Every structure is written in C-alpha cells, then in structure tokens.
Amino acid sequence: MSYEAFAYYYDSLMDQNFYNDYIQFINEHVKDYQTVLELGCGTGEIAIRLAHLGKQVCATDISKDMLEVAKYKCIDFKVDVMLSRIDMCDFAVDSQLDLILCLCDSLNYVIDLKNVKQVFENTYNALKKVDHLFLILILCIKWKQF
C-alpha cells in the first residue's frame, strides 16, 4: 500500500483512544524499559508519546511520507526520536534493545511467510531479553470485544 498522500491525513482517521490504551498498556507492563524500537511507526504517534515518558526511541517505517510527517510532529512536540526508513523484514541494530513494538496492524503488511519469519528472527536478535514483544496489539483488544 502506498502512503504517499494518505500519510498527511492518517492521524485524522485514527482513534486517539487506541494510542492512549497502547501507552497505558506499555507503561503498566514494561515501564522500566528504556530503549525502544518501533517497527511500522507510521506518523510517529506512539514513538512521540514514549519519548515524552523519557524513553529512548527509534521509530522506523518503510514509508518516507509517514516518516516525513513523524519528523515534523517530533519538532512540534519537542521530542527527540530517531527516525529511520527501513523495511521491518530486513533490519539489524547496533546494540540490543529493551523493547520492540510493532503495533496498529503493521505486521499485516508483510504477506510473505518467509519475510514474517525474518521479522521475528531480527526482533529476537535485537532484544536484550526475549520477554516482551508487542505485535498487532489492536487485534488483541478488538478480539476481546467479539
């Protein structure tokens, strides 16, 4: 899916309560974790909120347009978030991280099973401890409603 034009009005379509719920859930379960990588960050909403909580955040997306919006939001909200354009199927980190997030159905865009496996392998290798990985949290929340 191309986010070229969509990136600039994406936030107006998203429910802010979902973001609030994500942050509350993350804060309750892994509040002591300081280094965070977000895969598929979109316009950076979660990354910005985590940075406000004092986390060291690297936010990534494959869409340059989403990252452009995220860059300006970081400036507007006066937060320091490292933004990087990467494919979540092909990433490596210089130092291991406390937490890796992949939210808002981002993993659903990886349709090849081999690539999905690669995302999990890369994630496993990038974590200090393999005890927390939040993937597609929205599905868990929605599933409870059925």
Regions found by a protein language model. Give the residues of each.
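A short acidic, Gly/Pro-enriched loop at the edge of an enzyme's catalytic core
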Residues: 92-99
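Class I SAM-dependent methyltransferase SAM/SAH-binding core
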Residues: 45-90
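A short His-aromatic
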Residues: 108-110
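A short glycine-rich, Lys/Arg-flanked "PGG" loop and its adjoining helix->strand segment in the class I
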Residues: 117-129
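Residues lining the SAM
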Residues: 103-105
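Conserved class I S-adenosyl-L-methionine
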Residues: 1-40, 134-146
